[in-house]
C-alpha cells in the first residue's frame, strides 16, 4: 500500500518523488514510458527560465526567481553539471516600455 501515487516521471513527477523521498512517505511513480523524462520533459531546451516575461510582483515572478536561485544547489546535490549562460531577449519598439531588466 502506498501513501502517494505520482502520475508521470517527467520533470515535475520526478521532482515530487525526490522531495517525498526525504520524508517517511511510501510513494510510487507511475510512468507510461520505458524511462523517466521521455515525454514532454525530454523535448525541453535544457535552459533554466530567466523569468523575463512574468509581471513583477506576481507569484509567477517570485517562483521564477526562487526556482532559478535553487538550481545551483540542486546541481550540487545531484552532482550534475550546470552552467549559467544568461539570456538574450529581443523586443519590439512597442515592448520596450514594458521590458523589465
Task: Identify what each model region corresponds to.
Residues 1-2, 25, 43, 85:
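Short coil/turn connectors at secondary-structure junctions
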Residues 2-29:
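N-terminal Rossmann-like FAD-binding beta1-loop-alpha1 element of flavoenzymes
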Residues 6-8, 37, 44, 48-49, ...:
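Short glycine/serine/threonine-biased micro-segments
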Residues 12, 16, 32, 44, ...:
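Short N-terminal amphipathic alpha-helix/helix-capping patch enriched in small hydrophobics
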Residues 14, 38, 97:
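Loop/helix-junction capping segments adjacent to catalytic residues or to phosphate/diphosphate-binding pockets
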Residues 21-43:
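Glycine-rich FAD pyrophosphate-binding loop
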Residues 46-100:
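Dinucleotide-binding Rossmann-like beta1-alpha1 core, especially the glycine-rich loop
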Amino acid at each position: 500500500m502506498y501513501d502517494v501515487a505520482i502520475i508521470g516521471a517527467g520533470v515535475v513527477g520526478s521532482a515530487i518523488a525526490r522531495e517525498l523521498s526525504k520524508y517517511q512517505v511510501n510513494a510510487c511513480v507511475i510512468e507510461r514510458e520505458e524511462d523517466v523524462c521521455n515525454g514532454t520533459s525530454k523535448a525541453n531546451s535544457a535552459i533554466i527560465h530567466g523569468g523575463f516575461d512574468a509581471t513583477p510582483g506576481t507569484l509567477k515572478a517570485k517562483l521564477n526567481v526562487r526556482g532559478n536561485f535553487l538550481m545551483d544547489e540542486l546541481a550540487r546535490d545531484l552532482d550534475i553539471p550546470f552552467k549559467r549562460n544568461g539570456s538574450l531577449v529581443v523586443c519590439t519598439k512597442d515592448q520596450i516600455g514594458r521590458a523589465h531588466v
